[in-house]
Amino acid sequence: MAVCIAVIAKENYPLYIRSTPTENKLKFHYMVHTSLDVVDEKISAMGKALVDQRELYLGLLYPTEDYKMFRKLHNSYTDVMCNPFYNPGDRIQSRAFDNMVTSMMIQVC
């Protein structure tokens, strides 16, 4: 069940965060930012010392049965990136992307 979907920029900040309407909305935003900190720690550790490459593996980031959901999200994200009026690195404000994410969250919940 997807309760929060986030798109993260290459520079490690969120471009888009959407969560289901719950009383714990702030909790999901906090979890996204905390996850970014973990990724950042792994990346910075790689540059400081000789680190075992297996330690950098973050694990499977989505359940295998939800690959269709991931593919749909990726295709919609690609559409946003291909928009000539979108500046890479800006927050995603596309209504089509937002509607697609909302429909995914409704289907899953």
From Swiss-Prot:
InterPro entries: Longin-like_dom_sf, Sedlin, TRAPPC2L. The keyword Cytoplasm applies. Gene3D superfamilies: 3.30.450.70. It comes from the Eukaryota. It is found in: Cytoplasm, Perinuclear region; Endoplasmic reticulum; Golgi apparatus. GO terms for biological process: endoplasmic reticulum to Golgi vesicle-mediated transport. One of its GO terms (cellular component) is perinuclear region of cytoplasm. Keywords: Cytoplasm, Endoplasmic reticulum, ER-Golgi transport, Golgi apparatus, Transport. Belongs to the TRAPP small subunits family. Sedlin subfamily. May play a role in vesicular transport from endoplasmic reticulum to Golgi. Component of the multisubunit TRAPP (transport protein particle) complex, which includes at least TRAPPC2, TRAPPC2L, TRAPPC3, TRAPPC3L, TRAPPC4, TRAPPC5, TRAPPC8, TRAPPC9, TRAPPC10, TRAPPC11 and TRAPPC12. Interacts with the heterodimer TRAPPC3-TRAPPC6A. This is Trafficking protein particle complex subunit 2-like protein. The lineage of its organism: Eukaryota, Metazoa, Chordata, Craniata, Vertebrata.
